[in-house]
């Protein structure tokens, strides 16, 4: 579960998950999102953030009820994790109930977006939290700076380490078949292909980046590269 010891004066055994790209960390995140509102209002606010990230109020953000029912109906492991976290005092003071937290988590797992929308979302992260199409600031640059390392280290399930080695840019995949990745200050890219590999990533979505990368100079680890490729000159608002 990757609980990290975080003792307090009143709970010296407190442990909390710090990685939002694993189930326990995602559930912890849900417990802290708009806790002052009821669950429906919390979901509406989260979906509005998705719209802002994906191009504004006209972005086709939706919600898939069958996915929600599937997530909710096969969640024994998540309930187990939730009770373990609750038992260790992991949840913050703003925590409402485990039922609210997990149901919101299942609902957020059921949000729908288009591939174009995911590319705009990735471009917003590449642009430091400023949507390149609408000009609206969604996240602060500091928040984006904190998000991208987590995406690089954990965004691709058990393939994350190999992805970081082969491709070297922050990315996030989902079991719906989407992979979106962020080249900071350059562009955001989204690939959707629903066939999954053995670890839950899109089979085709994990293939193109290495072969589509004509020059590695944008990668943080290629400090020996001095030339700048045409890839670096891509307009962040450009669509393929």
Region locations from a protein language model:
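Short glycine/serine- and small hydrophobic-enriched flexible loop segments
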Residues: 31-35, 123-127, 214
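Structured C-terminal helix/loop/strand segments within mature extracytoplasmic catalytic/sensor domains
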Residues: 126-240
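Glycine-rich, acidic and aromatic/proline-enriched surface loops and short helix-turn segments
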Residues: 83-91, 124-127, 153-156
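Short, conserved, surface-exposed binding loops centered on an aromatic residue
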Residues: 110-113, 139
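Active-site-proximal binding-pocket segments
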Residues: 94-96, 112, 119, 123-134
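Active-site-adjacent helix/loop patches that line small-molecule binding or acyl-intermediate pockets
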Residues: 1-108, 116-119
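Short, mixed-charge aromatic SLiMs
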Residues: 1-10, 50-59, 109, 142-158, ...
């Amino acid at each position: 579960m990757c609980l990290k010891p975080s003792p307090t004066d009143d709970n010296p055994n407190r442990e909390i998950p710090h990685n939002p790209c694993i189930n326990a960390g995602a559930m912890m995140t849900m417990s802290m999102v708009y806790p002052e509102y009821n669950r429906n209002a919390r979901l509406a606010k989260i979906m509005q953030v998705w719209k802002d990230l994906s191009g504004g109020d006209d972005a086709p953000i939706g919600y898939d009820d069958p996915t929600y029912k599937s997530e909710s109906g096969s969640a024994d492991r998540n309930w187990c994790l939730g009770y373990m976290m609750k038992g260790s005092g992991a949840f913050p003071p703003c925590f409402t109930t485990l039922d609210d937290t997990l149901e919101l988590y299942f609902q957020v797992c059921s949000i729908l977006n288009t591939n174009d929308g995911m590319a705009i979302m990735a471009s917003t992260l590449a642009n430091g939290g400023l949507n390149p199409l609408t000009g609206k600031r969604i996240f602060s640059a500091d928040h984006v700076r904190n998000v991208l390392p987590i995406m690089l280290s954990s965004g691709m399930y058990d393939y994350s380490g190999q992805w970081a080695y082969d491709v070297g840019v922050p990315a996030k995949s989902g079991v719906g078949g989407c992979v979106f990745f962020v080249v900071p200050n350059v562009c955001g890219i989204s690939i959707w292909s629903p066939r999954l590999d053995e670890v839950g990533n899109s089979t085709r979505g994990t293939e193109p980046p290495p072969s589509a990368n004509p020059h590695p100079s944008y990668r943080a680890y290629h400090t020996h590269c001095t030339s700048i490729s045409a890839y670096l000159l891509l307009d962040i608002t450009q669509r393929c």
